[in-house]
């Protein structure tokens, strides 16, 4: 029997809980939220040729279309953390899914460019709210030994979603959807969102740490007793630091000396990884036309196959998080990405297709196992519960500027200077990331931030 005298005792109990009690929630959280976000964000990357043709887009206007979602995500991320702190994680996650159902359908049926841009912007807003809350939720339902690994699983699911999105497009392509291919593919996201919304409403429970912070000690104890299958005996009046901090914290607390290095490191990694991924990884289908094939089916198959490297890298990174640490994995990842981009930029014209494809795969492997995962993980693991949603929301919102820049500049630079020079120009991003991560020494894994 566990004795509960304060909310600190409840935090200790869930921090040491058997992982089997959270596996179902993790399944819905990771395989649901992250999968859908990745699908919606990347699906248009396979359709740039059709979008350009149907809406008569210049390289700049293509950049505007592709950037509309990340811009919406920036605004959503600004609000997501605060709303999740006030109303709970589950409500925000459910509302965002409902918005994605409506806007995915709207985008797929868009009769003109204005409607498409509007729907994609609102989709981005929902994803921006959804993503930081998802990472917070995963960290809060995982025990102390598995937080890093479980949070990092999001990147595995991200690349699974990219591969699946390419296969979905191939399926619709084979069905003969013709010029409406992009509409079917975008609309399919509404179906995924609807299924997840129904499952989430039926099965998903509120974050235990949010319950502990926002409910009485008696109510929180009952929640933990029922959901973690532990025998608890309540003693004492339940006063603790947790109850005093249940009101909305100020974002300025993130910049106090204790947390400054952590928030700068997490924000820098997340912003730079967003810039390098959205500036290169999002446009793998376009890069594939240079390296793999000019044929539409060949491009889609190549996109699906090369992104398997992302799945492998993300899985390896998640398994090594506790052993190697988030910072070391980030430095390794930035190094691999830098090598891949420089080699492609310098030797693209003189190397065979298989070697050039390998370097693109190396880019995805290094990114997914390193900075692509670790920035958000550091944000989720480096702060106590009362600050966590604020931290993940702040990191997510600032990092969206990197996503916006990367998404916007690639088509323009590519049209102006070609693939090799584009890769060399963008290689400065992982170089800067490597320098910053080397300079800022903070390791989030294994730290008990609740007791600081």
Q: What do the PLM-derived regions correspond to, one by one?
A:
Residues 1-452:
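Transmembrane-helix signature of 12-pass secondary carriers
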